[in-house]
Each structure stands twice: as C-alpha cells, then as structure tokens.
C-alpha cells in the first residue's frame, strides 16, 4: 500500500516504482463487416516502473491475450508467441496531482509488429513489402491470427500492426493503478490461408473508454513468467468481459 498517500512528486514517483501485473481490455468495432463486429482484446503482462535520472520510466511486457467476438460462434486468437512479440518502447510517464490524487499519463510511442521500419510512419499496405517479418516463427509473414466459425470453418489471417496506445491511470490508496487505454493502432491484412479471409480489417476502438480499462497490481518481483501470472490471474483481476449471445 502507498504509505501516507504521497503528497509531493518525488515521493509519488518512489511510491510507484515496482513490478506490476498488467491487465487491460480494448473494445473494438469493425464496420468493414456486413454487421458491425465488436471485439474485446484482453491482454495480460508485466509493467515495471523505475527511476532513471529522476524520471519515472514505464516498461511493458505482454505475455498472453484473449479475444472475444460479438458474432456468435466466431472465434479468433493470437498465439502467446505473437503476443510476446509486441514490444512497446520504454517510455517516461507524466504525473500530475488532481483533486488529491496522482494521475499518470503514458503518451503513445508507436511500435511495429510483423514488419520492420520506421514506427513513426503510417503502416505499409504492401502485401509484398520486403520489410515484413515473422515474429511468431510460423513461416508466414506478419503475425498469425487463427479464426474459426463454429465447426464449419477455420483458417488464418496474417497481419501487421502499428501499435499506438496511451494510458490514463490513477494511483489508488492500495498501491494499484487503474484507468483506461486509448488505442489508435493500425492493422493491415498481409494475406490469409483462404481467399474469403483476405479482406481488409481495421477495427477502431469503441468511443466509450469505460469499455477499455487498465489495471496494474503490484506483485513480488520474483513473479515474472507467463505461467506464474496466469496462475494468480483470478486473485488479481476482474472476470474477463463477455458478449451476451442469444
């Protein structure tokens, strides 16, 4: 817990330094489909805060993600290898005291997934771009998303992404940090295992940020593997959101 809720900036920074379990949800809408498809992507990982020359730095490492889709019987998912290939840049965070509570802002630092190049430039839309990479090492360009529709159909799409997210968090009295994520990422479908799947798909975040929460919970520094995190997931985080299916 944050002892005597830090009233000055330096003590607030020191209070935040540590190793955290990371949970976030991003709610997306894809209007390129016949009926709007909504998706929750729930990400798990570790966030570390440390001081460097008086600056409070944030480092993130993602280990596992779940995808929930509003369309009945449609499932999709990224392998843990693909999730672990997402490498946000270490970045300074800003702290401000608002109404007696410390607010933290992590600004967007674009990073590329499935393609190399300049992350500050728009994502390439060339399916034969020579800079395509295979970070999940499955022999296909970009990262692979597996898709299934009931028992009738399954396939894969191969995507690249330019991850662009920022966090707005509040330091709570119990030492947790909670808030929401703003995601302006870009996605490009490089190819697919079946022609029907090779369609543009670029979901945008749902405008209600309440559907895209972030929760960081301080944990012991020796808990640092995906297996250890997922073992204690239920004791740290809320239940994953679900879509109501008729």
Feature annotation, model-predicted:
Residues 2-48, 55-73, 106, 181:
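Tryptophan-anchored aromatic micro-motifs
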Residues 18, 137-141, 179:
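Glycine-centered flexibility motif
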Residues 40-172:
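Predominantly extracellular/secreted and cell-surface proteins with exposed
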Residues 3-9, 151-246:
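Edge beta-strand at a domain terminus
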Residues 24-29, 62-69, 110-113, 169-175, ...:
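Beta-strand elements of well-folded, non-transmembrane domains
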């Amino acid at each position: 817990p944050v002892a005597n809720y830090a009233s000055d900036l330096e003590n607030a920074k020191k209070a935040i330094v540590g190793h955290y379990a990371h949970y976030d949800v991003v709610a997306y809408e894809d209007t390129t489909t016949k009926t709007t498809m909504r998706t929750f992507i729930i990400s798990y990982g570790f966030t570390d805060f440390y001081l460097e020359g008086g600056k409070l730095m944030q480092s993130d490492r993602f280990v596992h993600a779940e995808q929930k889709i509003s369309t009945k019987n449609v499932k999709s998912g990224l392998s843990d290898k693909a999730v672990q290939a997402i490498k946000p840049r270490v970045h300074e965070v800003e702290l401000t005291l608002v109404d007696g509570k410390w607010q933290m802002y992590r600004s967007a630092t674009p990073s590329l997934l499935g393609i190399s190049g300049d992350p500050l430039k728009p994502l390439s839309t060339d399916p034969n771009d020579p800079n395509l990479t295979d970070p999940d090492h499955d022999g296909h360009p970009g990262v692979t998303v597996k898709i299934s529709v009931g028992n009738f159909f399954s396939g894969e799409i191969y995507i690249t992404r330019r991850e662009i997210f920022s966090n707005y968090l509040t330091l709570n009295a119990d030492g947790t940090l909670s808030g929401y994520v703003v995601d302006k990422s870009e996605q490009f479908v490089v190819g697919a295992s079946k022609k029907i799947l090779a369609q543009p798909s670029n979901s945008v975040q749902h405008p209600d940020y309440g559907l895209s929460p972030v929760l960081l919970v301080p944990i012991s520094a020796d808990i640092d593997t995906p297996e250890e995190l997922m073992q204690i997931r239920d004791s740290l985080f809320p239940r994953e959101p679900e879509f109501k299916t008729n």
